[in-house]
């Protein structure tokens, strides 16, 4: 589910350069550092905990027991932040 949601997010937003997924850990690589920093801060303000990596990558590491609805909500927060750019 995470891979499907992130690939859709990438196709909907041109500022995303790449998405990489390993299990439930995912990285969203943005085309520039400013965008990544803004999304990182905005997502945090909306209750989504992420990690900023290498300046232009946001890492998502949800718990293994996350429900599908919670995962969808987290990606929706990122999508909402991206729409404000």
Where are the model-predicted features located?
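Conserved N-terminal phosphate-binding loop of PLP-dependent enzymes in the Aspartate aminotransferase
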Residues: 1-85
């Amino acid at each position: 589910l995470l891979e499907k949601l992130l690939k859709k997010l990438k196709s909907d937003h041109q500022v995303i350069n790449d998405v990489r997924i390993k299990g439930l850990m995912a990285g969203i690589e943005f085309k520039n550092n400013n965008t990544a920093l803004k999304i990182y801060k905005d997502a945090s303000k909306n209750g989504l905990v992420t990690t900023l990596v290498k300046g232009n990558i946001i890492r998502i590491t949800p718990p293994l027991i996350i429900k599908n609805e919670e995962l969808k909500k987290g990606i929706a927060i990122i999508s909402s932040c991206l729409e404000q750019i």
